[in-house]
Design a protein with these regions (language model features):
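Non-heme di-metal
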Residues: 1-329
């Protein structure tokens, strides 16, 4: 097994295990969602993933004093990774912005769904605040305004395939890790506070980079359909960021103070995987190559290399070429 934070086979296998909890996989029996052998296999990958996240994020003693909103802000301010949005605004080419959107499609085409899974795990004002933030992501009762739909419009404006999961086979480990992280937190009640930290970090830190992405798209002349996703994000995120900081994290820790470090772990984990994601893209582009996976990686091979005992993936449509609207994300 390679580095659990970036191993493409490992992250692809984990992604497909999680997809059974969302739209499913074409040709795969929905009952596999709770198959004991599959859950055991998934658990082994999750443990490896969590171990690496803990190794890289370390303890949170330096952020243990003061109110949780300030501690979270301090943690976000300490992030030192490269700025992908600055690069794309200042010197990004059309092909690089297209690649960036391909990478982000796995996250943005089902944005909010993974956080929403955990709403019942919260209580009181934390639950209400989480639902309020999610309401924005779902378009405030208008399917046209759903963030996932707006991102699909951006992909279409860039000449990309906006179908759900159209580019799964091309996504490298660091990209899939950004998606799997929130699924892992959301599907385990034990990590509910980490999920709160994950969401709050996104809401509190995304306005400036999203604004730069919007300007980069505008420079390419994609039109309103191309950057409306980012424009809506910029307009809505100040309010959602305030809700996340002042109500969501505060209420979560007030209700369950023993989960404070878990909340900070979730924040540190998302900052880590986002930094590694940005470095992956920028490192590839700096030497003139694509940041996407070359053809040839498939899930059947990934499952085989990770010893999934008790299951035969081949007849169930796991590999490349599985067709239908629910095969990938």
């Amino acid at each position: 097994m390679g580095d659990a934070l970036s191993d493409a086979d490992l992250q692809l296998a984990l992604y497909c295990c999680y997809e059974l909890h969302y739209r499913g996989l074409a040709g795969v029996n929905p009952d596999w969602k709770w198959d004991r052998a599959l859950l055991s296999f998934r658990g082994e990958i999750e443990h490896a993933f969590l171990d690496r996240l803990r190794d890289e994020t370390g303890p949170f003693a330096c952020h243990s004093l003061g109110d949780i909103g300030s501690a979270l802000g301090e943690l976000i301010a300490s992030a030192s990774g490269p700025s992908l949005s600055n690069f794309l605004l200042e010197s990004g080419s059309l092909s690089q912005i297209q690649e960036f959107c391909v990478h982000r499609s796995a996250y943005q085409r089902k944005v909010a769904d993974r956080h929403t899974i955990a709403v019942p795990s919260l209580s009181g004002d934390a639950e209400v605040a989480m639902a309020e933030i999610q309401f924005d992501d779902y378009g405030r009762s208008s399917a046209v305004g759903r963030r996932s739909t707006l991102f699909a419009d951006t992909m279409t404006a860039l000449g990309l395939d906006s179908a759900y999961g159209a580019y799964l086979d091309e996504l490298p480990g660091p990209t899939l890790a950004t998606v799997n992280l929130v699924s892992m937190f959301g599907l385990h009640r034990r990590w509910r506070a980490a999920l709160v930290g994950h969401l709050a970090t996104f809401e509190m830190s995304s306005i400036a980079p999203v604004e730069r992405y919007s300007r980069a798209l505008a420079h390419l002349g994609t039109g309103r359909g191309g950057n409306r996703f980012d424009d809506v994000q910029v307009a809505g995120n100040p309010g959602d960021g305030a809700i996340a900081r002042d109500r969501l994290v505060a209420a979560a820790v007030e209700t369950e103070p023993h989960l404070r470090d878990d909340l900070l772990f979730g924040a540190a984990a998302v900052l880590l995987v986002e930094e590694r994601f940005a470095r992956h893209l920028l490192d590839a582009w700096s030497v003139g190559r694509s940041s996407l996976v070359p053809p040839g990686l498939d899930l059947c091979a990934a499952l085989g290399r990770h010893n999934l005992d008790g299951l035969d993936p081949s007849p169930s449509g796991f590999g490349r070429g599985a067709s239908g609207p629910e095969n990938r994300s």
